[in-house]
């Protein structure tokens, strides 16, 4: 009964539970496999993959903030070829039944399409998360500009959707005046779902050096501090589209996960909490049925339908 009440079905994804480690906070799964059986998870969003290898931004790239953290990693990754030859085969060999969501990033419409096409051919990749909202990449902050401009977003999403062999979920940035317009552009371009929110943009200063702590200057802010912002934006988008939303942004407990459902999410991404507690995801999964019992929630699917009806 516990298994059934946590099950989630989304385009391309039939999940035993809704808890998914967020991209950038879980590597390619190998680090956390030392702590627990990854088959406990609903899915994994692997680290962002670009066409060519990226070394990322100069250090320091991480800074602590009250109730959260800043990061300016800069999409460090080994590139598509290595991900296809090493990272995804390892996951398929060790966890053949675990559906993978591949995070795809790029610097042009053509690159997004090429990476989406290549990575979607991996048999364990069941969906793509299209990163059009990373705030830390050079090239005129191109990723952020795509996520802010509905026309650019439409073009990139359409190219990725046409190139991919699996459903495409679009990751939305909160750094926009009207997030609904970008969400609708993604929907019109053929996206199967949305993930939100990506990090806010922030910075910290070192009082001794009088300079920013991060070498990049600014970084993406995540953690519990952004949770209320995520809830508000998810609710705003859920009121205007029927696309399923994988909600993320500060989730660190079963209670927070259920709040995401009340906002309009259909599954849950867990990010920064993995750094403070490597068992964050299995802990949330274990606690979900207890918290659901406490608040009279029989199943997540029933809750999702109840919220969906209330938003109409």
Swiss-Prot record:
Residues bound to FMN: 23, 47-48, 103, 131, 171, 197, 223, 249-250, 271-272
Cofactor note: Binds 1 FMN per subunit.
Superkingdom: Bacteria
GO biological process, one term: 'de novo' UMP biosynthetic process
One of the record's GO cellular component terms: cytoplasm
Function: Catalyzes the conversion of dihydroorotate to orotate with NAD(+) as electron acceptor.
Complex formation: Heterotetramer of 2 PyrK and 2 PyrD type B subunits.
Family: Belongs to the dihydroorotate dehydrogenase family. Type 1 subfamily.
The name this protein goes by in its record: Dihydroorotate dehydrogenase B (NAD(+)), catalytic subunit
Organism this protein belongs to: Streptococcus pneumoniae serotype 4 (strain ATCC BAA-334 / TIGR4)
Native organism taxonomy: Bacteria, Bacillati, Bacillota, Bacilli, Lactobacillales
């Amino acid at each position: 009964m516990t298994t059934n009440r946590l099950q989630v079905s989304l385009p391309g994804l039939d999940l035993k539970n809704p808890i998914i480690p967020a991209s950038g906070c879980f590597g390619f799964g190998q680090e956390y496999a030392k702590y627990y059986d990854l088959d406990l998870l609903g899915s994994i969003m692997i680290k962002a993959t670009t066409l060519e290898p990226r070394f990322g931004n100069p250090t320091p790239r991480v800074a602590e903030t009250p109730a959260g953290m800043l990061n300016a990693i800069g999409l460090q990754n080994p590139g598509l070829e290595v991900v296809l030859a090493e990272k995804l085969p390892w996951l398929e060999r060790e966890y053949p039944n675990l559906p993978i969501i591949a995070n795809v990033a790029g610097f042009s419409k053509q690159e997004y399409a090429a990476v989406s096409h290549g990575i979607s051919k991996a048999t364990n990749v069941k969906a793509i998360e299209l990163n059009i909202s990373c705030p830390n990449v050079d090239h005129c902050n191109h990723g952020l500009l795509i996520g802010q401009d509905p026309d650019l977003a439409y073009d990139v999403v359409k190219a990725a959707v046409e190139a991919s062999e699996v459903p495409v979920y679009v990751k939305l940035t909160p750094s926009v005046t009207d997030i609904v317009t970008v969400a609708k552009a993604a929907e019109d371009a053929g996206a199967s779902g949305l993930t939100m929110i990506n990090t806010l943009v922030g910075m910290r200063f070192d009082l001794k050096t009088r300079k920013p702590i991060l070498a990049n200057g600014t970084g993406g802010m995540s953690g519990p501090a952004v949770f209320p912002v995520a809830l508000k934006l998810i609710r705003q988008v859920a009121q205007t589209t029927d696309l399923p939303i994988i909600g993320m942004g500060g989730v660190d407990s079963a209670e927070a996960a259920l709040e995401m459902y009340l906002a309009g999410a259909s599954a849950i991404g867990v990010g920064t909490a993995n750094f403070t507690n490597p068992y964050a995801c299995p802990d949330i999964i274990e606690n979900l049925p207890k918290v659901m019992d406490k608040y009279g929630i029989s199943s997540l699917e029933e809750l999702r339908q109840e919220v969906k009806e209330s938003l109409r």
